Amino acid sequence: MSTQTEQPMVSVEAICESPLGADLSESQCLLLAEASSIIGLDVGAPLLDEGHVDDRLYVVSSGSLEVFKPTGGGDTITLQLLHSGDMAGILGFVDGVPHSAAIRALTQCELIVLDRKDLEKLIEKDPQLVYQVMRTVVRAAHRILGKMNAQFVEMSNYISHQHGRY
């Protein structure tokens, strides 16, 4: 049986070593660690379900996860693999939109979890921290969009047989 376990406190080191801590001071990492939690996932455990809404950002601390969509008849297609340092739930965290795909653990995983309301509580205390975290989130979204654009161009070239590539 697949399970998900939550532990209340994230270490300062885990935040500092994650993408979230890349542009933060140690004291800012401490504030963010206090606002975050960590979860563990067993192999096969779901992290997110397609269509579900949640306001949390997930950062893979260890392990691998699969982002997938059902294709019908019980089959699925893998959209992306997530590894240490990758983020999940970005659009739900920023905008509260339903998840466009599902995510499940391929291996034992640990993930840092940051709830939007917990980050918002830090706006008055340390607005620079919130700004840097959101910059990191936008950078991650930008990388994903860049990959999707490249895949779209490759698929378009394949379909139209242009540029002599296929």
Give the predicted meaning of each segment.
Residues 1-166:
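Cytosolic regulatory regions built on CNB/CRP/Popeye-like sensor folds
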